[in-house]
Structures are given as structure tokens and as C-alpha cells.
Amino acid sequence: MSKRLENKKIVVTAAGQGIGRATAIAFNNEGANVHATDINDQTLETLNKEYPNIKVKNLDSTNKKAVEGFSASLNQVDVLFN
């Protein structure tokens, strides 16, 4: 397993299932510091149980104030996968 994304902070939206979930897992496997967002708590909880290194956050990306607050809490992001 390569660690070419080690020390990179990556946000993946819609990460609860499908392409978003697969992408979050792939980035995690490459050593990234992954922050996964979705509006479905259940799928996020499952993702976090299977991959405890992935940080999960219930976030509605259509809510501008919520997104701004989340972004501010992260300080710097290297990659945003939407």
C-alpha cells in the first residue's frame, strides 16, 4: 500500500455511499487525512466503523453557513472531491 497522500487533508462530499464512499476509502488507503461528509448519518457511521481513520461529518453541502463553518474548522484543505 502506497502512502503518497500522507499528510494531505482531503474532504470528500457525498461520501456515505457509491463513488464518494469509494473515493474516501481510496484516499484513506493512500495515507490521506480524510474528512468525509454526507447527509446520511447511518452511512457515515458505517463508513467510520469500517475505516476509523476517516473523520465523518453530517453536512448538507447546500447549506452555505454549515459549509463555511465546517471549512473554517479545517483550516487548510489540500483536496476537495465533490
Feature names for model-found ranges:
Residues 27:
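Aromatic pocket-lining residues of Rossmann-like dinucleotide-binding sites
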Residues 9, 14-18:
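Conserved glycine-rich cofactor-binding loop
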Residues 30-46:
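Conserved glycine-rich Rossmann-like NAD(P)H-binding loop of the short-chain dehydrogenase/reductase
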Residues 13-14, 77-82:
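Rossmann-fold scaffold of SDR-type NAD(P)-dependent oxidoreductases
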Residues 14, 37-41, 61:
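N-terminal Rossmann-fold cofactor-binding loop
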Residues 57-69:
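The beta1-alpha1 cofactor-binding region of Rossmann-like NAD(H)/NADP(H)-dependent oxidoreductases
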Residues 9, 33, 55, 76-78:
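Structural signature of beta-strand start/N-cap positions in the alpha/beta core
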